[in-house]
Curated annotation (Swiss-Prot):
Gene Ontology terms describing biological process: nuclear mRNA surveillance of meiosis-specific transcripts; regulation of siRNA-independent facultative heterochromatin formation; regulatory ncRNA 3'-end processing
Molecular function in Gene Ontology: molecular function inhibitor activity
Localization (cell): Nucleus; Cytoplasm
Keywords: Cytoplasm, Nucleus
Protein name as catalogued: Enhancer of rudimentary homolog 1
Gene name of the encoded protein: erh1
Protein task: Forms part of the erh1-mmi1 complex that recruits the CCR4-NOT complex and the NURS complex to target RNAs. Suppresses the meiotic program during vegetative growth and promotes the meiotic program during mating. Recruitment of the NURS complex to target mRNAs promotes mRNA decay by engagement of the nuclear exosome, and formation of heterochromatin islands at meiotic genes silenced by the exosome.
Length: 104
């Protein structure tokens, strides 16, 4: 699972429940920004403050319960947005959270 270039544009399409009214989208200039957005959605839904460390297993459970999440990543070669699976984003979120936990 190779990451996109650091400056890749990403559009996140998220549907939190089966009701289409729960659909949201967000637009990001990097993979890190997209992951930080997902972490922010988790913190908002779980009433976790930014200063608290994130329980990674609870984050994964929350992420698994999201009805649908599609990251569209801009590919300069094709000059198009390429859809990725929810697990692709989860993999990169895991790397991000693991690295964040190692920072004192």
């Amino acid at each position: 699972m190779s990451p996109p270039p650091a400056e890749s544009h990403i559009i996140l399409l998220i549907q939190q429940g089966s009701d289409p009214k729960t659909r949201i989208w967000s637009d990001h200039c990097s993979l890190r920004s997209a992951i930080e957005y997902i972490v922010g959605v988790y913190q908002t839904n779980q009433a976790v403050s930014e200063k608290e460390s994130i329980d990674v297993s609870r984050f994964f459970n929350f992420f698994d319960e999201i009805y649908d999440c599609v990251p569209l990543v801009y590919d300069r070669h094709f000059r198009a947005y390429i859809p990725h699976e929810k697990q692709w984003l989860l993999h990169h979120a895991q790397e991000y959270l693991t690295a964040a936990r190692q920072i004192p």
